[in-house]
Every structure is written in C-alpha cells, then in structure tokens.
Amino acid sequence: MRKIQGYLFLLACLTTGWIAAQELVSSAPENADVYFIEPTDGAEVASTFTIKFGLRGMGIAPAGVDMENTGHHHLLIDFDGELDMTQPLPVSDQVRHFGKGQTETEITLPAGEHQLQLVLGNYLHIPHDPAVMSYVITVMVK
C-alpha cells in the first residue's frame, strides 16, 4: 500500500511540475511571423552591421511584461544546439536577448559565413506555442 501511495505521490509531483511548466508557455496566433528586415539572406556585410527585426501578427513588450500576443526578440548567432521550447532561452554569445523590446541592434562578427535566426520569447524569455521563429539566414562578413 505504501508503495502505491509513493508512486501516486511521485506521479502527482511530476504532473504538477509539468502543468506548471506548461502554464509559463504563452500562446501565439497561428499567423504570427518574425523575420529579418535587414540584412537579407545571402547579404555581404561589414564586420559591424545593423540587424533590424520584423514582426507580424503580434506586438512587442519588454521582458517581465505579461501581455497577450506579445513578446520580445532573441537573436541566435551560429547556433547549432537544441532549444528547450518550454524553458527560458539561455543567455550566451550565441543567444542574444533583447528584453527591453528592441527591434534592431548592431553586432560585430568575425570575417566569414554566419547563420542568424530570430526567436520571439514571452515575458519570461520562453518561446511561444506555436513557436514564432524566423527562417535561418546566412550573411557573409567581409
């Protein structure tokens, strides 16, 4: 009997944790779209260049502001890892956060080919469901 109670308790804990994690993920309209205004895919750019972010079907709100159908930008640079779409996006040189609601930035990259992608995150930096992600673009830094 104690064993069954133990399993039920464990199941309740796991289920509650899963439900709590799911509640942190914000929904996004099916037609939401994040994209690069500039640079365009295949662009040749200087080592320091401006990136402008575009968004359709949703609005921009800073991190910490929980408003329906809003989020803020995250820029993936040469990112080849896996994202846990139920957790806050990590902070690193490859995952840049724009939690103040910025819609453009200036970055410096070394010469060569680089891949860029945008991901919209909610007030907690967690990607929406469905995820609002741009296509990966490639830029050539001179």
Range-by-range predicted roles:
Residues M1-L8:
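Bacterial N-terminal signal peptides that target proteins for export
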Residues T16-G17:
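N-terminal signal peptide c-region/cleavage motif recognized by signal peptidases
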Residues E23-A46:
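Short, compositionally biased P/S/T/A/G/V-rich stretches that sit at domain boundaries
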Residues F49-F53, T103, G112-L120:
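Short, well-structured beta-strand segments within conserved domains
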Residues G54-G64:
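Short amphipathic, basic-aromatic surface patches that mediate peripheral association
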Residues E82-D84, G121-D129:
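Short acidic/polar inter-strand loop motif in beta-rich domains
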